[in-house]
């Protein structure tokens, strides 16, 4: 049965079906008000040629506010992501027929599909719509130059001739040409199948959009990916209605050097093969899905801008016909001249407190947002109301575990441990940044209070940010939750241990935590050195191996001389607080604990004096400090009870 007979819309060609799909997306994925704003944004800026209304790269970049400067030669415009975004949009606009229609002209229908895909709104229209856009995003970034037929002395077969005829009207991207490889991953494009199923056009899909295997053979060039990553790092905190210029203007050379270094650290996680000149699909898919799940979130907020028009904001303007390129430039210049005062600086992720971070900066917090979730839902930490409260810093409080205990154990919420150092016994001064996300409050080893139901599903993670991004996820298996393998362990004698096995105490000698599972971090009792362990195997510990780990890889052991260690308390969303008292924030709870400990210590000291014990002043002072929990050898755990 032909596709035309089975299609209720009477459309049989990819172009017609693509248009019908865009209409369905527009009707089901946007509210009437959003669609009105969308149309105004598009048609008020659209160019026209031969009756076709469209956007070019300049219009797209100008509207979104994406800089088009060359980072190496134009200090005033250090970002150059405009061509990369335009390439991605031209590919996504052809969905679900990238094989024959990409690169697409950016008509209104194409832009509708782009916005639906990048803002993940397609679940409203596609029953089988998988929210994993990884294959589409890879195809939009891969080096996909036009397919050039190879010269051959042999005559083409009938099948080859029919294939060429079927594709002659739109050569498309080579990434979508079929090929014979042996990639063993599920080859079905669920999102494309769902789109065609929704139009009752599966036969057209089978005829024209054969299973794409060449995507597994193409690669993303390092330069292309770096330019995109630099933009994502700069605009990661962007909210849907915020101006991009608040993030992309005023970037000095020092900030851009920091952005480039962070981008290179992320690129290193994809293990790009220099000989092949880029990032493979397999490395891209595994690393994004398991190690950087929120990497493309900034594009969601960026393309939400299409759904709000300043022209319709509390005023009506007469309709203008399609603009020429000259008129478009004049209009943009007029808007720039009449723009209001500059936007206020973006809100900081960190709260004011007892110290300012020597490690966290806007670029590094953007990197954290690519994999750290919010405490309340599956969104990244920058897209929520979560804030970081300064709890402990060696730069501010010194390298004493006494102060560490006093500040950290009284914090009743999740914490972020982050440290910087360099390799011990090495001439290299390269800075290495490590960290751990600990979702439960730190507790004493004798604590019997169970974790709340809201925090029990949150998993810890251990990570390296530089010089190479490495992410070790928490182990969800209940078998990994044992009393002797807590997530975090604290002792004034042995120091701090993350993801280690704790030996039984001995009366004859001092025992020390040992590395266990796929990852662990050990910090000595003077907070001067740290050991980071990562292995490609080990599913019985707190942390699992990294996404791109290979069984052939040797275990990694880094011994660092520490520069700085910081603990940041995570202040949850107000409506989803983990506090026992919903009326108190974690900051207020910590303050109350300090006040209670001080009163309790003073009370017990007075009782001790009245009873006649502790004749010496030194003994009395020690009693006061021990009662307050400031000194002593109590081991401290977090997450050790499962």
Swiss-Prot record:
Q: What is the disulfide pattern of this chain?
A: none
Predominant place of localization: cytoplasm
The record ties this protein, via InterPro entries, to: TLDc_dom
Biased composition of type Acidic residues is found at 326-335
Q: Which residues form the TLDc domain?
A: 358-571
Q: Which UniProt keywords apply?
A: Cytoplasm
Annotated region Disordered: the residues are: 149-171, 319-352
Q: Which Pfam families match?
A: TLD
Q: Provide GO CC annotations from the record.
A: cytoplasm
Q: Where in the cell is it found?
A: Cytoplasm
Q: Does the keyword ATP-binding apply?
A: no
UniProt lists the family membership as follows: Belongs to the RTC5 family.
* Its biological purpose: May be involved in a process influencing telomere capping.
Q: What is the name of the protein in this document? A: Restriction of telomere capping protein 5
Q: Which organism is it from?
A: Penicillium rubens (strain ATCC 28089 / DSM 1075 / NRRL 1951 / Wisconsin 54-1255)
């Amino acid at each position: 049965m032909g596709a035309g007979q089975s299609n209720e819309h009477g459309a049989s060609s990819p172009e017609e079906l693509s248009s019908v799909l865009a209409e369905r997306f527009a009707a089901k994925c946007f509210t009437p008000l959003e669609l009105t704003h969308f149309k105004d944004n598009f048609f008020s800026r659209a160019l026209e040629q031969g009756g076709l209304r469209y956007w070019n790269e300049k219009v797209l970049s100008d509207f979104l506010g994406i800089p088009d400067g060359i980072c190496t030669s134009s200090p005033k415009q250090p970002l150059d992501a405009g061509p990369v975004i335009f390439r991605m949009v031209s590919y996504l606009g052809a969905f679900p027929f990238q094989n024959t229609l990409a690169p697409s002209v950016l008509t209104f229908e194409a832009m509708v599909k782009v916005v639906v895909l990048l803002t993940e709104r397609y679940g409203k229209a596609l029953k089988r719509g998988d929210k994993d856009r990884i294959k589409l995003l890879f195809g939009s970034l891969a080096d996909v130059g036009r397919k050039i037929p190879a010269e051959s002395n042999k005559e083409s077969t009938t099948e080859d001739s029919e294939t060429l005829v079927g594709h002659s009207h739109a050569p498309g991207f080579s990434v979508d040409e079929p090929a014979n490889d042996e990639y063993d991953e599920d080859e079905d494009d669920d999102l494309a199948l769902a789109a065609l199923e929704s139009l009752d056009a599966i036969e057209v899909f089978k005829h024209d959009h054969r299973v794409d295997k060449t995507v597994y053979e193409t690669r993303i060039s390092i330069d292309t990916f770096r330019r995109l990553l630099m933009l994502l790092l700069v605009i990661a905190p962007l909210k849907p209605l915020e101006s991009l210029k608040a993030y992309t203007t005023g970037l000095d050379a020092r900030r851009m050097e920091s952005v480039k270094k962070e981008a290179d650290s992320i690129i290193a996680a994809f293990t790009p093969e220099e000989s092949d000149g880029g990032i493979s699909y397999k490395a891209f898919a595994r690393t994004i899905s398991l190690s950087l799940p929120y990497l493309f979130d900034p594009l969601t907020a960026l393309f939400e801008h299409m759904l709000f028009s300043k022209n319709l904001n509390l005023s009506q303007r007469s309709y203008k016909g399609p603009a020429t390129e000259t008129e478009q430039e004049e209009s943009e210049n007029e808007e720039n001249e009449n723009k209001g005062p500059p936007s206020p600086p973006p809100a900081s992720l960190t709260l004011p407190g007892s110290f300012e971070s020597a490690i966290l900066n806007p670029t590094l917090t953007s990197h954290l947002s690519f994999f750290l979730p919010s405490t309340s839902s599956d969104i990244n930490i920058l897209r929520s109301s979560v804030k970081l409260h300064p709890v402990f810093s060696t730069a501010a409080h010194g390298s004493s575990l006494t102060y560490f205990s006093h500040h950290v154990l009284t914090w009743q919420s999740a914490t972020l441990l982050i440290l910087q150092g360099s390799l011990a016994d090495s001439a290299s001064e390269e800075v290495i940044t490590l960290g751990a996300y600990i979702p439960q409050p730190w507790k004493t080893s004798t604590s019997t209070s169970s974790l709340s139901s809201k925090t029990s599903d949150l998993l810890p993670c251990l990570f390296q940010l530089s010089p190479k991004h490495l992410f070790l996820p928490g182990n969800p298996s209940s078998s990994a939750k044992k009393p002797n393998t807590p997530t975090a362990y604290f002792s004034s004698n042995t120091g701090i241990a993350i993801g280690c096995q704790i030996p039984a105490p001995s009366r004859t000698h001092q025992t020390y935590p040992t590395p266990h599972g796929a990852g662990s971090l050990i910090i000595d009792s003077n907070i001067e050195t740290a050991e980071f362990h990562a292995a490609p195997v080990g599913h019985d510990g707190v942390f699992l191996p990294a996404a791109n780990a290979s069984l052939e890889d040797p275990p990694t052991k880094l011994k660092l001389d520490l520069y700085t260690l910081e603990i940041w308390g995570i202040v949850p969303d107000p409506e989803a607080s983990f506090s026992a008292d919903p009326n108190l924030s974690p900051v207020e709870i910590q303050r109350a604990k300090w006040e209670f400990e001080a009163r309790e210590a003073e009370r017990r000291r007075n009782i001790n004096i009245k009873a006649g014990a502790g004749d010496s002043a030194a003994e009395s002072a020690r009693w006061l400090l021990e009662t307050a929990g400031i000194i002593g050898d109590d081991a401290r755990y977090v997450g050790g009870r499962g």
